[in-house]
Amino acid sequence: MSRQEKLAALASTGVTKTELDNIDGGTARGTTAIADGDGVLINDAGTMRMTSVETMATYIGTKVGGGLEFISSTDVSAVTNIAFTGFDSSKYDSYLFTFAHITPDTDGVGIYLRTSTDGGSSYDSTSGDYLYFSGRGQEGANTYYRQDDSDGNTTYAPITNTIGIATSPEALVGFNGTLEILHPHLAEYTGGFTKGFFLNPAGSSTFMTGGFVRAAQSDVDAIQFGMTSGGFAAGGTITMYGMVNS
């Protein structure tokens, strides 16, 4: 086919310069966000085809895998308990929870967790249900402490020790930290790790880290957070992420 014939064939398709620029990259880059429903031009074994960004995302996910995926987030209100039930063993191996500025409505109490094996219909709250150990360092010389299931309440697993809210800045700081729960879909002793920062009732800066297991071989498919007395004060956010398994 001669050059003239090629040009004539191209002209007969009604292709515009703008469309050609989009194909060859000559158009200027912008900040238009990609969204569901958008199309992507691909070369399918020599044939130009349009596919959707959803199809592209699925394909890339099968090649890349891993990483964190947002599941849900709760802006804390004045409630007694907060539950997360977005566990999905077909997608995630483990889970990460982040706590931002979480405070109790009562001075000198801590945050705890309880597990569920029935999707959140009930939570494990019998004495002896949890084994745990945690250590914390506080502002001041040689102020290090530990707590474990031999000298504490075992109807829950602690995330923090006592948080101060009586005066500023304690009430403004709250608890900031993370919780990891590992492979809860397995019928094993499901456990995890916690760490975070808060101010105690005396206003001392405190860093606490620890670990726990549910003292029974069973899966976990929901988590409940609560306070050792009273409930949550309004404010702050708890967010759940899944660690993608493929």
Task: Place the predicted regions along the sequence by residue.
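Short, intrinsically disordered N-terminal pre-domain segments
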Residues: 1-14, 244-246
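Surface-exposed molecular-recognition determinants
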Residues: 19, 24-28, 37-39, 43-246
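Parallel beta-helix/beta-solenoid repeats that form elongated, surface-exposed shafts/blades used
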Residues: 30-32
